[in-house]
Structure formats: C-alpha cells, structure tokens
C-alpha cells in the first residue's frame, strides 16, 4: 500500500527539480518571442513525396556551387526537420553538396498517423521507405545519409535494405539495438527527469507557452552534463514557429516513434553485412543513448570509422561541429561518385 504514495513523492520531487532546469527568464523570453518577428526557418524549396498514401514533407537546400551529390539528413524521435541547425549543414552546402531534410511521418508537415494503434503501428523499415520515397520524388538515384538518434537507426536500415540507394552512412548518437539488455541503459535520474518534464508540460500541451517549455526542457535534458551552452531563445523560436507557421506538435508521435524503435528490434546481425562506407559518431557524455551502444555496433559494421567526442551529450552543439564536419566530409569525399 505504501508503493503509490512513495511513487507520488518521488515524482513530485522531480517535478520540483525540473522546474528549475528552465532558465529563470523563460517566461520573459517567451513573451519577447511572441512580440518579435520570427526568423524564417524554412529557407529551401519544399514539396511532398507520397509513400503508400502517406505524404512526407521535404525541403531541398541547394548549394550555390553544386557538385552533383546530395546529403540526406534524418532527424530523431519526435523531431521535425527544423531540428537541424544551420551551422551543421552550411559547411556541406559550401562544399557543393545539396541537402535534403524532411519531416518523419507523424510530425511537422508530413502526415500525422491518426489511426495509429499499438496493433496497427509502423516500424523503422516503414520510416526508411519514407526516405526512399523522397529520393524517388526528386529523381535522385543515390545519396549520402546522415542520421541522428532514431534517424541513425533509420539510416542503418536504409544501408541494410536499400544498399544501392546509399553512398555513405553516418550514424550519429544512435544504436544498433536500443533495447540491448547487455548494455548500460539510461540512468534512473535521467529517466525520472523525462517523466517529470512530461508530467509538467506534455500532459497539458494546451497553451503555446507549455509547448515551448516542453521543447526547451527536452533539449536541456538531452544536453546532459556537456560543457557548453545551448541557445534557449533559438529553441523557443523554433518551437513557436512550429506552432504558428506549421502544424504544431503531435502529442502522440513520441509513443509512435518509440514503438517503431522497439518493434524493429536488433540490427546487429544485419549490420555485419553492410557494405556501405560507414561512420559512427557519438558523444561520450550522451545521457540518452550511452556511448557503449556506439562502441558495440560500430565494431559490427565492416570497416566503420568512429568519432567519439568527449563532452558531447545527445545533441549537436556548435563547438563540436568542425570535428564532426571534417570526419563526415572525409568519408563522403572518399566515396564520391564524382
């Protein structure tokens, strides 16, 4: 009988703890953003691909000096294509690569799966076909793929199932089997923090401010103990942009994407057969997908290169981009069709 009261106290403590994780000026920041003219976060040519009657919204960022090759960036769980910072992809544009970003099914301007149930769910394989549908819609035969978190898992699946469509694979802060019982899972503190944030904000996404705070809270948690600052205002601006200029936030998409990861299971055996030149990048301080995941699945992909970054959490801080860019550019250049 004591279990429920103890759990309630536990959750309440973390709710209080998470309240102080947001910057003290968060409310004034939100009010400021609502009064200002928002930056434009959709700057490329946009369109829709069709995958079995599911519309996938994409955006093409063209290089001013195109070299004829394309890089596809695939975002993670519950993240729209706006998650990619300009400072990440601009160096590739400067090198002549066109960039494609798209909203995974269930969020952004792509179709939201309204008839989704646990019995009628979709997998990472299905999400991989969304990426292929985007290539088909644009008449692109092959591309370099860079995926972060769940996007890395989808990119792995593309290398496994569609090897003729992928030139190189870069899997960032990802895993080959997130449910691996032999590896270190997320800490109880981090898990409790996620629950606390969800109870505080996601359970009542009724106001713009709540939605913006939820998005910022997640980003601050994913940073972990990384020795760098995040741009609170930019994160809040993007969240508000999603609300007023796009379709807003789908409260069900995290459950959908989480189940897609779960039912897709392990790719360990299949990774051993990948012939695509591959790179595994991971933050040593990642609080969500521990570095042990990267160290394990990287050894399974034949000849995979690795870059493990001390201090980086589960995000893409600007201070580490020069090293990340150099590593990805090297593998892409060595395996160019030109």
What are these regions (language model features)?
Residues 54-112:
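Conserved HGGG/HGGXW glycine-rich cap/lid loop of the alpha/beta-hydrolase fold
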